[in-house]
């Protein structure tokens, strides 16, 4: 995982001011890892703001709205 400088652009594209609810954790394979401050769940975004999740060791693209809700509300997938 690459550390700093933090890249907030993908998250800002999607949620604007709500970025304050997240911590930037690092970058890996061109994807930005953000952690929600309350639920402690990760939101993984590419440069265009598309969402990904880890499934069986692979990164799979998923619907942003559903993934954002899961992360923010602490909903199990």
Language-model regions, residue ranges each:
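Mixed-charge, Lys/Arg-enriched low-complexity segments
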Residues: 1-14, 52-77
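Acidic, low-complexity, intrinsically disordered interaction modules
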Residues: 19-61
């Amino acid at each position: 995982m690459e550390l700093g400088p933090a890249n907030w652009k993908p998250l800002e594209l999607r949620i604007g001011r709500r970025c304050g609810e997240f911590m930037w954790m690092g970058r890996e394979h061109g994807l930005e890892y953000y952690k929600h401050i309350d639920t402690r769940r990760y939101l993984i975004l590419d440069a265009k703001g598309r969402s990904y999740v880890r499934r069986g060791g692979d990164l799979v693209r998923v619907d942003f709205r559903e993934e954002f809700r899961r992360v923010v509300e602490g909903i199990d997938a």
